[in-house]
Amino acid sequence: MAVKALFADQRTDGGFAPSWAPNYSSLDATCFRLTQAEQIGVSGSEAALVRTVRFLTQRQRLDGSWEEDETVAATAPVWAQPGNMAARLYLTANCGFWMATYGGVDSAIRAADYLRNHLEPDGRLPSFLHTHWLAAGLWHRLGHGGLSRRVLSCLAARLPDMTAGNLTWLLTTLLSSGVPASDSLVQAASSMLERYQNPDGHWTSDDGPEYDVHCTLEALRVLSLTSTTSTWKGPLN
């Protein structure tokens, strides 16, 4: 029933519509739905998920990147803005990560190559913070440890700037891509996330109070995955 509910509003092309364009299949909204699918353990062979992956495959550009259609430029948020390099790199890292996760290896490799061409020597990408951990997760999953490590070193210096939402997304991405729980960045991020827990046990979402429950569940999930080496002992009483 949970799987059916998750994909109930899937569009005929396999994608999902965002709040900012209700009649359009968005790459960003579709990747978020794949995030939710992974959270509840949807099988890669699930028919609706296969259609979702096919949608992303068909929307990939010839150079290996992904970008929202220019027809939604007037309403798309900055992270999905067509024609913007930062948004293109973010969507390429996000789509590429999920293609690698659900078996679209050829598409994932093309995305990884596109991102590599924009990686700066110090491990930065000319894009948003979350682009970095998505790219690192993609490269790690594909066996490009050197590229992944460069980005992770860059992210280590940015940890003090991260919110609870940032940290849960970073940890979820890295752990699901195979970065071990004992990794120094994973441990540092986990420790920071512990400190962000509010006295009543919840974590505050970047997206407003209505998303605090989701943020809290994700924080609990990632901390349970790092608990063998983390000092976390569970939610406060």
Each model region followed by its residue ranges:
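Preference for long, amphipathic alpha-helical scaffolds in soluble/luminal domains
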Residues: 1-237
